Amino acid sequence: MNQDRETLVFNKITKTFQFGRQTVTLETGEIARQASGSVVVSVDDTVVMVSVVGGKNVKPGQDFFPLTVDYLERTYAAGKIPGGFFKREGKQSEKEVLTSRLIDRPIRPLFPEGFYHDVQIVATVLSLNPEVDSDIPAMIGASAALAISGLPFAGPIGAARVGYANGEYILNPTKTELQTSQMDLVVAGTSRAVLMVESEAKELPEAVMLGAVVFGHEQMQAAIKAINELADEVNPVMFDWAAPAKDEALIAQIRGIAGEKLAEAFRLRQKQARTVAINEAWDAVKAGLINEETDTLKANEIKGIFKSLEAEIVRGQILAGEARIDGRDTRTVRPISIRNNVLPRTHGSALFTRGETQALVVATLGTKQDEQIIDALAGEYTERFMLHYNFPPYSTGEAGRMGPPKRREIGHGRLAKRALVAVLPPEDEFGYSMRVVSEITESNGSSSMASVCGGCLSLLSAGVPLKAHVAGIAMGLILEGNRFAVLTDILGDEDHLGDMDFKVAGTAAGVTALQMDIKIQGITKEIMQVALEQAKEGRLHILGLMKEAVDGPQELSAHAPRLYVMKINPEKIREVIGKGGETIRSITKDTGCEINIEEDGTITIASVSSEGAEAAKKRIEEITVEVEVGKVYEGTVVKILDNNVGAIVSILPGKDGLVHISQIANERIKNVSDYLKEGQVVKVKAIEMDDRGRIRLSIKALLEEEAKTAQATADAFGLKTQ
């Protein structure tokens, strides 16, 4: 029976646009069609598929927006098979976590207040050109997928990477170009406003950083235009959702119960006392408006109104020119305390306290073997500098679960690392690997910037010759209509209730890291300029205090390893390592040193003990010394050859030579064992070395030389020799 063959037809829509020197293609309608929105982004052989799914119903009792973003790298994208026993991708790498956050941050504030449906964004890297980072395509793809999903999303957004070299900005620099760039900045925003900035730089002026943000925002308009065209052509069915109407009567009730109490609470300068007073105000609201018959949705609505009232009061006080929550004006940095070398056995340590935020930061020096190996999709590499940030629950006076680092901890650690990388000494001047760990012991805002300050101080404590001191500060913003206030060194409450979180780190010469998250649209270039200049003022103040506490690098700790560098002939590396690593293991075990050997013959010996290092150096020198023909050596007979050909004599570690039977004595001998025994110490002369490195030794040659010397002496004195 014949059947007509059916052909599956895809409603495929494609948009292509020029993005600087790169051509970007957006495709939808062929892959992942059951998702709310799905877009495949292609940029010079880098291909990322991004899907968006919006939940149709809200979970009972849901009182927050449950957005999840996962960026996933598949090893097949780079033509690789995963390592390890299971041969499949496992938990997210640090790069995957950081890129997930990069996508999340500019998208989250564009969903409307009160929208509590589940939204999941999954970005999967399908193909990777090592020169084109997949993060910008993933961000553009997420924006495009949301734009065609029908979800209530106030986008689209665009994203761009900006480099800076020879006084010019570079749009979407390649991996190779970034190696010589003075800046690596990622900016995201809508057609009207910037929403997010993430960057590191090599001590660049504030004006250059601001110019990069503006340049990136201008250039990303090409992506926004293409996404809008794609959405128009797709013409998605809009999500059936409307913002809940405000209950003005309920708002008035809550204001009447808690308004004055909250206003008084936010005049209390100490965080814990303020928290108690806010909780008392909330208890009064609960007692008056919530009972056993109140359903969860109504309870959540009441709680939301209470939180909005908190924000309204704090923001109003600041814009009215009143003192901030802790009594400061808008430009003052909280009191700072610095203690260095606080831990006796660590290589370097510092306790940095700014108001109610405190970081105990520890630096550890290691060797080449301690470097972090990164098995990246674009290729394996190592990092000599690591910074890890820990945020335990006790830092905010809470009890909670301890476990592996969360996304926030990884992100904060990365920001602090970006801030310090620019001032690290080059490897050829300071051969150590370095690990900094920031333990946040108290937190009330800006703990990542405390980690920058403490990290710098701990590295100086460890003796690391930094190019300059680095300090960091977090800025905030309150914006209502045409009125705004930029806040220096924000508290945790000011971060939650404000419109911007703007973190700047750098030296006295310029910016080394900048991170900005904006929760509203309408932040102008002028506001960003004011924030940057005010941040510089605060940063210079902190740098002055840091320099007073620790002027420069201190001496290496007695507990830190010392590095000794020597050079050998690269052809001798095999001899130092030995068969199966036997020789090098023996040296490290006997001397207690760590030894690293480079391909060019550079050997680095790391040891806390100078005696151990000298012993290791001597062993290596003995192994690598060249045998000289004509030179006399004292050696040990290690073997009498079975065929009576001669004996093997060890003259240097790893250097054996043959004494042929004819080279043992002047007279003809029948048995080698009549003259030599294993373990016997003899003097030999190196008489020949062939092209394979085999050494021929002679005892006879020395006997002949001794005879000639004796004859010459006798002749000089007129004596007869027998």
UniProtKB/Swiss-Prot annotation:
It comes from the Bacteria. PROSITE patterns: KH_TYPE_1, S1. The keyword RNA-binding applies. Residues 630-700 form the S1 motif domain. One of its GO terms (biological process) is RNA processing. GO terms for cellular component: cytosol. It is found in: Cytoplasm. It is an enzyme of class 2 (transferase). It holds the Pfam family S1. It catalyses: RNA(n+1) + phosphate = RNA(n) + a ribonucleoside 5'-diphosphate. Its EC number is 2.7.7.8. Keywords: Cytoplasm, Magnesium, Metal-binding, Nucleotidyltransferase, RNA-binding, Transferase. The keyword Nucleotidyltransferase applies. Its cofactor is Mg(2+). CDD domains: KH-I_PNPase, RNase_PH_PNPase_1, RNase_PH_PNPase_2, S1_PNPase. GO terms for molecular function: 3'-5'-RNA exonuclease activity; magnesium ion binding; polyribonucleotide nucleotidyltransferase activity; RNA binding. Residues 561-620 form the KH domain. NCBIfam families: polynuc_phos, PRK11824.1. HAMAP family: PNPase (MF_01595). Involved in mRNA degradation. Catalyzes the phosphorolysis of single-stranded polyribonucleotides processively in the 3'- to 5'-direction. Belongs to the polyribonucleotide nucleotidyltransferase family. This is Polyribonucleotide nucleotidyltransferase.
